[in-house]
Amino acid sequence: PAKGANVFWKCMACHAVGEGAKNKVGPELNGIIGRKMGSIEGFNYSDTLKEHNAKGDVWTAEILSQYLANPKGYMPGVKMVFAGLPKEIRADDLEAYLKTFNADGTK
């Protein structure tokens, strides 16, 4: 998780985790692994993520990894402007860090 915490610094411009995390430009990411896509109340998701939500799709580690490699390529129509994790950064490090946060932001 420590390596992932360093990677998350890049995400913090748009996302938050931890107790009291609020939506920013992007939704808060507490408990993202295993969470239904497009499900954070009060966040205005893209039509793409609203469709995934309606189908009951859930963020798994594998899906998140593919998404983070190329968000708009993996899910055309998403609002996320991030181009994707550089190849030298391991998505599983970031996922390990995100997994340390429960849905309520506690560890």
From Swiss-Prot:
<dbReference type="InterPro" id="IPR002327">
    <property type="entry name" value="Cyt_c_1A/1B"/>
</dbReference>
<dbReference type="GO" id="GO:0020037">
    <property type="term" value="F:heme binding"/>
</dbReference>
<keyword id="KW-0249">Electron transport</keyword>
<dbReference type="GO" id="GO:0046872">
    <property type="term" value="F:metal ion binding"/>
</dbReference>
<feature type="binding site" description="covalent">
    <location>
        <position position="14"/>
    </location>
    <ligand>
        <name>heme c</name>
    </ligand>
</feature>
<keyword id="KW-0408">Iron</keyword>
<dbReference type="InterPro" id="IPR009056">
    <property type="entry name" value="Cyt_c-like_dom"/>
</dbReference>
<dbReference type="InterPro" id="IPR036909">
    <property type="entry name" value="Cyt_c-like_dom_sf"/>
</dbReference>
<keyword id="KW-0479">Metal-binding</keyword>
<feature type="binding site" description="covalent">
    <location>
        <position position="11"/>
    </location>
    <ligand>
        <name>heme c</name>
    </ligand>
</feature>
<keyword id="KW-0813">Transport</keyword>
<feature type="binding site" description="axial binding residue">
    <location>
        <position position="15"/>
    </location>
    <ligand>
        <name>heme c</name>
    </ligand>
</feature>
<dbReference type="Pfam" id="PF00034">
    <property type="entry name" value="Cytochrom_C"/>
</dbReference>
<feature type="binding site" description="axial binding residue">
    <location>
        <position position="80"/>
    </location>
    <ligand>
        <name>heme c</name>
    </ligand>
</feature>
<dbReference type="GO" id="GO:0009055">
    <property type="term" value="F:electron transfer activity"/>
</dbReference>
<keyword id="KW-0349">Heme</keyword>
<protein>
    <recommendedName>
        <fullName>Cytochrome c-550</fullName>
    </recommendedName>
</protein>
